[in-house]
């Protein structure tokens, strides 16, 4: 499950498709 691909929660990543705080 790529949280960046799904734009999921990634506060540590930060990156991704608008995935900041799900």
UniProtKB/Swiss-Prot annotation:
Region of interest (Disordered), ranges: 1-22
The keyword Kinase belongs to this UniProt entry's keyword annotation: no
GO cellular component, one term: mitochondrial matrix
Cofactor: FAD
Top-rank taxon: Eukaryota
Sorted UniProt keywords: Electron transport, FAD, Flavoprotein, Mitochondrion, Respiratory chain, Transport
Main location: mitochondrion
Location(s), subcellular: Mitochondrion matrix
Cofactor note text: Binds 1 FAD per subunit.
Keyword Secreted: no
Function of the molecule: Accessory subunit of the mitochondrial membrane respiratory chain NADH dehydrogenase (Complex I), that is believed not to be involved in catalysis. Complex I functions in the transfer of electrons from NADH to the respiratory chain. The immediate electron acceptor for the enzyme is believed to be ubiquinone.
Family: Belongs to the complex I NDUFA9 subunit family.
Self-association state and partner proteins as the record states: Complex I is composed of about 45 different subunits.
Designated name of the protein: NADH dehydrogenase [ubiquinone] 1 alpha subcomplex subunit 9
């Amino acid at each position: 499950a790529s949280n960046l691909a799904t734009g999921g929660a990634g506060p540590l990543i930060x990156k991704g498709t608008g995935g900041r705080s799900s």
